[in-house]
Design a protein with these regions (language model features):
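Non-catalytic DNA-recognition/assembly elements of restriction-modification systems
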Residues: 77, 96-99, 105, 113-114, ...
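Amphipathic alpha-helical segments
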Residues: 64-98, 196, 309, 342-350
Length: 350
């Protein structure tokens, strides 16, 4: 009769009494099930007639005066019999419709995941052997690293190169310096012969978490945070905070985000692993933007298509790798840079 349960009803099978919150209807010359189904069909009307504030109620007088269509008793019974014949089918089709609605809501995301999986396995487009080999890209990257080392822009340890190859026993091995390790168990699927498996760290000229900023109320130098990486894959500065101008010297140029930088949320339950790709267009009139310590920046060498890496990072197999390798407690998951460096990727020719 009142509250959130206005209109709720049932048929009693035992002797009992009710309190003031319930209205008992004892039918005379009315089939009780017919009355039950009529009241059930009228539930929304009862709710709309409820009066009051926090605890709306419907009075007994309104129920007594509620118009009731009265067919003959045998007709009441026939109506009930037909309803009880149809209700199981209605419930079944309601369940099917709910499942169909859920499928329609999810099909776009599932289709996207399937297409991404076909793409990273080299099955989405025909393979053309005249387009070169991924091995050439890796050789170019190693030459570029050597050049940067000679210019003093890389350390000697950065020259250590991971090479993944298939041995004569048809198993995959990784060579770093003089050490060779079988990694066959890490390989999730076969790739076209002109492709190569490699670690993400090999393909990046800059792979780092951002820094912990000191903020300012002056809206001049925005800081890219987790909230800027939207679930849709788009980026937004609507929730960005701003850097204290007095701390600018803390941020080297390499921390200033550039076109096609891949940005990965690296902490936080529910958002860790979320991926975006940066475009300077979102800066508007801001001179630059830097990432905070909850964001990892993946900046590839120029001969690697950043969008290809971005879509790889969005794929279900990479997202599962991220999920499986998170550290920290349930409430504060964390994705370490070392996990990203070791991320195994299939690399096609450019």
């Amino acid at each position: 009769m009142y509250g959130a349960t206005i209109g709720k009803l049932g048929i009693v099978g035992i002797k009992l009494t009710t309190n003031q919150a319930c209205c008992a209807c004892t039918p005379i010359f009315i089939y009780n099930k017919f009355l039950f189904y009529f009241l059930m069909a009228s539930k929304q009307n009862f709710i709309e007639q409820g009066e009051g504030g926090a605890q709306p109620n419907i009075s007994r007088i309104k129920l007594v005066n509620y118009l009731f269509p009265l067919p003959p008793l045998k007709e009441q019974q026939r109506i009930v019999n037909k309803l009880e014949e149809l209700i199981p089918h209605i419930e079944h089709y309601s369940k099917v419709q709910a499942e169909l609605d859920l499928l329609n809501r999810n099909i776009k995301e599932q289709l996207k995941k399937s297409i991404l999986q076909y793409a990273i396995e080299g099955k989405l487009v025909p393979q053309d052997e005249t387009e070169g080999r991924a091995e050439v890209l890796l050789e170019q990257i190693q030459k570029e690293k050597l050049k940067l080392y000679e210019e003093g822009k890389l350390k000697k340890k950065d020259l250590e190169h991971s090479t993944i190859f298939k041995g004569e026993d048809n198993k995959y091995y990784e060579k770093i310096g003089k050490n060779v390790t079988c990694i066959d168990e890490e390989i999730p699927f076969e790739i076209p012969k002109d492709w190569r498996w490699c670690r993400l760290g090999v393909l990046t000229i800059f792979l780092s978490r951002g820094k912990s900023p000191k903020y300012s109320e002056i809206k001049k130098y925005p800081v890219f945070a987790q909230k800027c990486n939207l679930k849709s894959g788009k980026l937004s500065l609507d929730a960005a905070k701003f850097l204290d101008e007095r701390t600018l010297s803390k941020w080297r140029d390499e921390y200033k985000l550039r076109n096609n930088d891949i940005l990965i949320n690296s902490t936080g339950t529910g958002t860790v692993g979320r991926v975006g790709i940066f475009s300077e267009q979102i800066l508007g009139n801001y001179p630059f933007i830097v990432p905070d310590s909850h964001i990892s920046v993946v900046r590839t060498f120029s001969n690697i298509d950043s969008y290809y890496i971005y879509y790889l990072m969005c794929s279900s197999i990479i997202q599962q790798y991220v999920e499986d390798n998170l550290a920290g407690s349930t409430n504060q998951k964390e994705l370490y840079i070392g996990v990203l460096e070791k991320l195994l990727l299939p690399l096609p020719p450019l």
